Amino acid sequence: LGAIGFLGSDSPRHAERQRALVGRRLFTRCLLPHPERGWTTGELAEALEVPVQAVYRHLQWLRELGLLTEDFPGKADDPKRVRLWHHSLPRAWEGVELHARACLAGYHDAAQSLAGEYGAADATLPEGMLALEKEDHFDIELREVPPSGDAPAELLARLGEGVGYFSAHHYPIADSMPFRILDNCFLQRPDRAWTAEEVAAWAETTRPTAYRHINKLLSLGMLARCRAADGGPPASAFHLRGGSLATAWQAIETRVELVLDSYRRVVGELA
């Protein structure tokens, strides 16, 4: 539940805060022991020992994920009830996986189109650089974003928003700083290694701000770390993984598949 974002994004040491506690109880007291049952919000609140208002956010999140559905009896004195899709956690999770893969397939097509626009470097590493082996935490948020056009800027905006690199705070996306950093620094120059200071200078921003966007691209797997081969500066720099968007996206897809496989095994154990 923590890995898919349901319990929030705070540090694990805050795991007992109200949101996480209610989220875990929702599964351990209600959904897992009674997959065949539909629940009203009042019944859930009583089982979880919280006010009704504390249940709504969790239900909305799980409905958007595709894990829960609602039954409407159609009678005023018989309120709607929420339940697991197909009355089964494994089958409900199959639907979540299908949705994730459908999103991924659409973004695959966008990435392939963009790869033809941007081209590729002659080598997987920038000249004079060595790979800097450091495993960055993989963090991706797949969401469905409708197509807005076939222009490169529109495709890149959709791709980045679909994997969580761009957010609603960045509209218009094509004019935003994270867009310009990804586009101008890394996609248009797949042969070059950039330090955080160089990215900050180019984007006319602070080093911490540049690092925030670089770290997001690292967590997506879009960028890789490198250093000077001769042992001199830079000791730490960043480049487009594999020297092309096509290669970088392939690595992202592979990691998503591994994550989905691991989640499926956990769901099977819970069932």
For the regions a language model picked out, list residue spans one by one.
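Short, cationic-aromatic polyanion-contact patches
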Residues: 19-23, 73-98, 172-178, 228-254
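A short, conserved structural fragment
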Residues: 63-74, 218-230
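Charge-rich interaction segments
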Residues: 129-147
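Short alpha-helical segments that sit at the start of domains
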Residues: 1-28, 141-183
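Short helix-capping/hinge SLiMs at alpha-helix to coil transitions
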Residues: 31-37, 58, 186-192, 213
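Amphipathic alpha-helical dimerization/coiled-coil segments
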Residues: 90-134, 243-271
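Short amphipathic alpha-helical interaction segments
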Residues: 49-64, 204-219
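Short acidic, hydrophobic short linear motifs in intrinsically disordered regions
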Residues: 35-47, 190-202
